[in-house]
Amino acid sequence: MGAVTDDEVIRKRLLIDGDGAGDDRRINLLVKSFVKWCNSGSQEEGYSQYQRMLSSLSQCEYSMGKTLLVHDMNLREMENYEKIYVDIESSIAAAHEKIAECKKQILQAKRIRKNRQEYDALAKVIEQHPDRHETLKQLEALDKELKQLSHTKENAEDKLELRRKQFHVLLSTIHELQQTLENDDKLAEESQESPMETQNP
């Protein structure tokens, strides 16, 4: 399991603290304290309301700071998701290119196989005339070319198998990354709903 980032720690702490909950109540208390302070009948009462007003104002400033912090954190996450999206698009494009290349290699392997069959048939015809020196020379040349084609075919098949394995790994990685992004989105939605459920029991 990977190390927890600072953004994740901050986000969890803000969610536990109930970010956004009670902001209206704090503002209302601040307004009421201000009205009572204006209407205070004595210096002692005015000082008491003044202290309450400062306390409410401090809470509002603290809440606003948390909100701005969450906003900045969300912006960073959006930028990160956009980068991941671009990487996925690039990986998909590369996968399509590899698929096209594999198809070309398959067609080449089929042509090699067809050529080998044709050469085998021709070799059988040549073998019917073993008494001719020129025919034997042609047969040797064809046999050499056939071996080269067979070697080329084996190399192409090995390369094609390697590309298939690489493509399978790439698709698995893309699937895991998409699953991770979906899980992150679900966790983010659940985390946003949790403070609302706490505020409205």
Swiss-Prot record:
It comes from the Eukaryota. Keywords: Coiled coil, Cytoplasm, mRNA processing, mRNA splicing, mRNA transport, Nucleus, RNA-binding, Transport. It is found in: Cytoplasm; Nucleus; Nucleus speckle. It holds the Pfam family THOC7. GO terms for biological process: mRNA export from nucleus; mRNA processing; RNA splicing. Residues 182-201 are annotated as: Disordered. One of its GO terms (cellular component) is THO complex part of transcription export complex. Its main location: cytoplasm. Signal peptide: none annotated. The keyword Ligase does not apply. The keyword Translocase does not apply. Residues 75-194 form a coiled coil. InterPro entries: THOC7/Mft1. GO terms for molecular function: RNA binding. Component of the THO subcomplex, which is composed of thoc1, thoc2, thoc3, thoc5, thoc6 and thoc7. Component of the transcription/export (TREX) complex at least composed of alyref/thoc4, ddx39b, sarnp/cip29, chtop and the THO subcomplex. Component of the THO subcomplex of the TREX complex which is thought to couple mRNA transcription, processing and nuclear export, and which specifically associates with spliced mRNA and not with unspliced pre-mRNA. Required for efficient export of polyadenylated RNA. Plays a key structural role in the oligomerization of the THO-DDX39B complex. Belongs to the THOC7 family. PANTHER family: MAINTENANCE OF KILLER 16 MAK16 PROTEIN-RELATED, THO COMPLEX SUBUNIT 7 HOMOLOG. This is THO complex subunit 7 homolog. It comes from Xenopus laevis. The gene is thoc7.
